[in-house]
Amino acid sequence: MSRRSVGLAAVWAAFLVLAGSTLVLAEDEAKMAPEFTLPDLAGEDVTLSERLKEGPVIVDFWATWCKPCIKAFPDLQEIFDNYKDCGLSVFAISIDGPRSTSRVGALIKSKGNTFEVLLDPAQKVAKKFHVTSVPRTVLIDTEGKVAWAVTGYRPSNHEKLAEAVAALYPEGCEKKVEGEEPEAAEGTGE
């Protein structure tokens, strides 16, 4: 095989991998997210449907041994900080097994993250979401539909997720977060 053929084959393979990721994303969107209840770090149960009553939810499957997962945390924290006052929740769902679950809380604390961490050591919820690798990030709208999803971490994912979250707040949220009130319409004096 010539060098050119090898090069073209590599480009084609890369295209297929990227196209496959995009197809999986499109396939996920508009599906209903599976219901779940998981314990948080304090042992309190958190239920998806209950939280969706308050606003959209970002579900991020991760593990302590996954470096790309940890690289994504500052991006998730930034989005959470921008929208938490408008009801957005972020569930960082650890799929660490029973032997490494004890490291989850310390790692989150060391990173300064304030979003919720849930534990899925048997990976039952991860299986419901068809997680095959981490990180796996899923944005769920208030109706329980998957609005956006991606597997893996790239810096560009942050911008795409931020845009998808913003689209769920057509009236805008960031103004509310910053403490600005919408201007009242002027009366007609009647």
Which residues make up each language-model segment?
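N-terminal secretory signal peptides that target proteins for export/translocation
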Residues: 1-5
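Bacterial N-terminal signal peptides
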Residues: 9-21
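Boundary at the C-terminal end of the N-terminal hydrophobic targeting segment
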Residues: 24-26
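A short beta-strand-turn-helix
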Residues: 36-57
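Short pre-active-site segment immediately N-terminal to redox-active cysteine/selenocysteine motifs
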Residues: 55-57, 61-65, 133
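Structural microenvironment flanking redox-active thiols in thiol-disulfide oxidoreductases
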Residues: 70-111, 121-128
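Thiol/disulfide oxidoreductase modules built on the thioredoxin-like
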Residues: 106-114, 120-166
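Non-globular targeting/processing and membrane-anchoring segments
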Residues: 170-190
